[in-house]
């Protein structure tokens, strides 16, 4: 089966779609471009399906290359048989290829190799095949004594032959595969404390065991961390007797003089060579599985955060709370432009509540503020109380919300922030970042490394390269799904646009600063290093509002302008209608999609996208996201009682549940069992970061500041 057929079978796709899609990928087209503008080619695959195909394609190509390498390496040793070559070529996993190659891999001089060099392989074969022999095994071994090699007695010769048998058994691909599956299916992970008297976060695992195949991913990561910190001792417990028996069953038994020798070699092979290797491999697989799931959860959480609904028209006063250094203030207009900044000291040690309220009143009036944003970090609760009092006393129409501070300090001290606002202090930049997260979460959060946004689980324990790669894909997909205003976007935002590198993004910003705003998508071709391929991949995602061609403000790709223009013509409307909100009934006016597609020589899926865009040009998919929850009065944990119904916002999703912000400065946990009145495989199947949910208080532990919530009424 060739690669295309295999991909089609595995992913349940049509072979011709797979072949054409692979060609597009190989030509250097991006996943967002292929997903959005080549639907006829792909059969309508979305970006998730395309990334799955791309990753599997890469794996299979690496697999094929490794097969060729292994065949060549074994062939160079003169040990490649037709049967072995067939086994290698038919292998469906890299692990199987490595198992087949293991007996031929060059390694340090082992006991078995020394024995082979001394001519003891024939004796080893006699043991393996249980050959008939006169007398005892030692009598047979006497014929293989070799002076000056260390095998100069029957006992030494027999021991050397056994070393060959041990290595042969331990490296047999079928034996390894069988014992690997046995270990996975039957072994337990056993955890003990290195110091049972020490209080640590890992106490639940001080005397813990669980089947390897059942242990949840979050426990794997917790145990791994405890082991790294020296608090836990971990081992894999396998029934060695049963494992040895399974191994022995794969070799011939004739009850001759070599039977006990073979039994001993098999037991030694498992205990000394196979068990440690398989147990390490089992632990490594657990960790990879857990990390992969954690990265996927992080990715889903990040997507929810980036896809949060912008709060348009908000004139924002952002407060970055603090104690000794005070609360930093940044006031911004609807576009995010800084109007004012300063510091107030409502909290200890100064406790200047009256002065803070006076300054808030002054700024709210002067800058026509309608929304206050408060960071959720240090001193947030005390700051919220002051803001709540101020609203009740002086500004009843004002509203406020709490935003996550994660990553704000990373951005404010970054080179990017110093380039954007060279004359502002880092504290002001941090407060501005909080306010802009409300106005346009996507545009602001792309300035921060995704790993620093804080919506993951055990994120610092994960494979950082894989985490960065996966999260980068998420940012890229969301940015291109939303689209970017090429005349206002930062270089950070532009760098995630399909086909645009960080260098080209900076060149776009430099070009518009030097030449003024872009008025036509074709002008992009004048940007240094933005070549034809980059233009093809990027143009549809870069929007120009108020330009020469109204289609430039839409997601219609320039290559489809002739089709879009003809659709408008048949509908009897001008492109200028797009600037007035679109043409909701264009489909009725222009005729049926099927007929138009045939007449205009355009694919149906592409035509549907064009018509949808003409109905509502430049539509922002984030407008479908839940609205931000605003408050006018503060709530504390002391106000909570079991049974109380509240509206909250999902802040984080983990393997065992979801953390929900209910406005008391301590997120409550909805355990996975309380997310729905049915079985839930993973919390992300029910909620995602940014969702607004109704919850009921189940239990409040005020001393430990823990809140248990449920999303199932009456549960």
Short names for language-model regions:
Residues 140-157, 207-211, 225-228, 235, ...:
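Low-complexity, acidic/Ser/Thr- and charged residue-rich accessory regions of DNA metabolism proteins
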Residues 12, 309-311, 476-510, 632-670, ...:
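C-terminal accessory/binding modules appended to enzymatic or scaffolding proteins
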Residues 49-52, 59, 63-318, 322-423, ...:
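Duplex nucleic acid-engaging cores and interfaces of nucleic-acid transaction enzymes
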Residues 30-31, 42, 46-148, 481-624, ...:
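Accessory alpha-helical DNA-binding modules that contact the DNA backbone or grooves
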């Amino acid at each position: 089966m060739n690669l295309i057929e295999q991909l089609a079978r595995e992913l349940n796709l049509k072979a011709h779609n797979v072949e054409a899609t692979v060609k597009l990928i190989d030509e250097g087209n991006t996943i967002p471009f292929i997903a959005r503008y080549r639907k006829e080619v792909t059969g309508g695959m979305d970006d998730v399906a395309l990334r799955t195909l791309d990753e599997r394609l890469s794996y299979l190509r690496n697999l094929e290359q490794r097969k060729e390498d292994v065949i060549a390496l074994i062939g160079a040793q003169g040990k490649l048989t037709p049967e072995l070559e067939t086994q290698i070529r038919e292998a469906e996993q890299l692990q199987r290829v490595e198992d087949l190659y293991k007996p031929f891999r060059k390694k340090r001089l082992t006991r078995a190799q020394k024995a082979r060099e001394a001519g003891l392989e024939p004796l080893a074969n006699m043991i393996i095949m249980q050959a008939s022999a006169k007398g005892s095994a030692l009598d047979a071994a006497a014929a293989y004594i070799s002076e000056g090699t260390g095998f100069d007695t029957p006992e030494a010769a027999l021991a050397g032959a056994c070393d060959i048998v041990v290595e042969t058994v331990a490296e047999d691909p079928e034996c390894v595969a069988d014992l690997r599956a046995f270990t996975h299916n039957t072994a337990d992970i056993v955890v003990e404390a290195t110091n049972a008297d020490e209080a640590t976060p890992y106490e639940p695992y001080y005397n813990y065991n669980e089947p390897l195949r059942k242990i949840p991913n979050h426990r794997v990561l917790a145990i791994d961390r405890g082991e790294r910190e020296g608090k836990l001792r971990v081992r894999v417990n396998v029934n060695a007797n049963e494992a040895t028996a399974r191994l022995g069953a794969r070799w011939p038994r004739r009850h001759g003089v070599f039977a006990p020798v073979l039994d001993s070699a098999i037991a030694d092979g498992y205990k000394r060579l196979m068990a440690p290797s398989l147990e390490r491999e089992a632990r490594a697989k657990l960790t990879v599985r857990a990390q992969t799931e954690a990265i996927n959860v992080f990715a889903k959480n990040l997507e929810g955060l980036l896809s949060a609904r912008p709060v348009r028209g908000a004139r924002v006063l952002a407060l970055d709370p603090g104690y000794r250094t005070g609360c930093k203030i940044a006031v911004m207009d609807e576009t995010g432009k800084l109007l004012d900044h300063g510091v107030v000291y409502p909290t200890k040690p100064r406790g200047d509540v009256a002065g803070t309220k006076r300054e808030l009143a002054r700024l709210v009036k002067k800058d026509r503020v309608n929304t206050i944003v408060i960071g959720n970090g240090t001193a947030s609760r005390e700051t919220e109380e002051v803001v709540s009092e101020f609203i009740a006393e002086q500004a009843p129409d004002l509203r406020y919300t709490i935003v996550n501070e994660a990553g704000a300090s990373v951005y404010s001290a970054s080179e990017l922030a110093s380039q954007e606002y060279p004359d502002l202090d880092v504290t002001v930049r941090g407060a501005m970042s909080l306010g802009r997260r409300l106005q346009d979460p996507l545009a602001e959060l792309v300035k921060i490394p995704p790993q620093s946004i804080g919506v993951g689980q055990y994120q610092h324990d994960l494979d950082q390269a894989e985490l960065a790669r996966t999260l980068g894909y998420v940012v890229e997909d969301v940015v291109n799904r939303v689209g970017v205003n090429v005349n206002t976007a930062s270089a950070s935002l532009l760098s995630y646009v399909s086909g645009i590198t960080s260098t080209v993004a900076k060149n776009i910003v430099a070009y518009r600063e030097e030449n003024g705003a872009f008025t036509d998508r074709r002008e992009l071709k004048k940007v240094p290093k933005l070549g034809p391929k980059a233009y093809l991949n990027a143009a549809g995602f870069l929007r120009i509002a108020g330009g020469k061609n109204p289609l430039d403000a839409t997601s219609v790709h320039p290559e489809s302008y002739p089709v879009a223009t003809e659709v408008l013509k048949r509908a009897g409307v001008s492109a200028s209608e797009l600037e007035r909100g679109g043409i909701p009934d264009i489909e009725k006016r222009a005729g049926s999609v099927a007929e138009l597609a045939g007449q205009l020589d355009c694919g149906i899926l592409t035509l549907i996208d064009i018509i949808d865009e003409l109905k509502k040009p430049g539509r922002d998919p984030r407008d479908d996201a839940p609205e931000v929850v605003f408050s006018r009065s503060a709530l504390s944990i002391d106000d909570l009682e079991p049974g109380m119904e509240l509206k909250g916002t999902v802040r984080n999703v983990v393997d065992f549940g979801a953390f929900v912000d209910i406005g008391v400065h301590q997120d409550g946990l909805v355990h996975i069992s309380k997310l729905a009145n049915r079985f839930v495989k993973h919390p992300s199947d029910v909620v995602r970061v940014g969702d607004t949910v109704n919850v009921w208080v189940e239990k409040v532990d005020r001393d430990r500041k823990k809140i248990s919530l449920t999303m199932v009424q009456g549960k």
